[in-house]
């Protein structure tokens, strides 16, 4: 399980720019307008052999500054409670503001490592101006420029030097771990209770009554798993109104330590933005995935087209990752709950699939010959053969060709789709690599 780092700060100090710099991506939208980060951005960072998870907490305003400040305070409080280390970003050009002081006051109360980061220090002349941030009472400011990258290497060095070794509480026995994930109050604990016939987890109508990730051994009907409840939220009064960010942080912890993820969504709401956020986290962690539409018993006036309509809506929202099993179930009535575990076992087995090299080439090379990679700037790419890598967590394949750099994402997606058509790879991501031969 990785350490989690949260970036917090008032609007327009460069949180998303720093997030993009550290993750070497353009995942977070960056704009001069305040509040452009409306969804919680999540990614992984690798530095000097250390991998950690990072979250851009964003921040946006609705109607008034007071509501905005309240929202920021909630997110900072959640970060304090759930993240391992906090990067508190301030703006050296505009200096200390009242909102900076409010956030600093919240951070000083907790026994959590806070690294004060003075952003927009694009030249040495601005370094001296960061001295005013000592008044925030959070130690030495690290001068960085997220826009050009200066100082970020030193920041990462200091960051990883303060990581604690994460100990996963998953039992050591080699049994697949299934994380049941989803936004608060979709029925995660109810599903585990229904499967085990035990009131192992506290269940109420209040979102977030599960207090910790709980590993429950399931050993029935020839199936053996550890079921992991992702804990909804563990709310303190001061953060009770903001469950989305909290539940996503908790989901990250369980997703990273699982083999298969069951993403529960609420049938009465279909698939929402928060469901897509968690879906994306599962994809980035390359976990097996099953989507379960819970509370199906609450849908009235169902007809033969109802399931098709729901399934089509889900696949449109999750595209291009559409090769995912979808099960319509009810933890309350126990309808199709055991099918969930049967499919989970199938997905787990698919992740272990080994396809002979001869079979791969016999099927794929004629397809490639019929639909070769596009000619790029007069360069003709010729794929010569393909083989599967061994000792990988998910099915991974290497295509040997003369010009690997000229094969772009759309053609890789074409190859993936062809592989999914010819081999049952439902529910698991696959890796496709190009190598020169």
Swiss-Prot record:
Listed GO biological process terms: ribosome biogenesis
Q: The KH-like domain covers which part of the protein?
A: 353-437
Which GO molecular function entries does the Swiss-Prot or TrEMBL record give? GTP binding; ribosome binding
Question: Can you tell me which residues bind GTP 1?
Answer: 9-16, 56-60, 119-122
List ligand-binding residues for GTP 2. 182-189, 229-233, 294-297
Tell me the keywords, alphabetical order. GTP-binding, Nucleotide-binding, Repeat, Ribosome biogenesis
Give start and end of each EngA-type G domain. 3-167, 176-352
What role is this protein assigned?
A: GTPase that plays an essential role in the late steps of ribosome biogenesis.
Do you know which NCBIfam families this protein is assigned to? GTPase_EngA, small_GTP
Give the record's family classification. Belongs to the TRAFAC class TrmE-Era-EngA-EngB-Septin-like GTPase superfamily. EngA (Der) GTPase family.
By what name is this protein known? GTPase Der
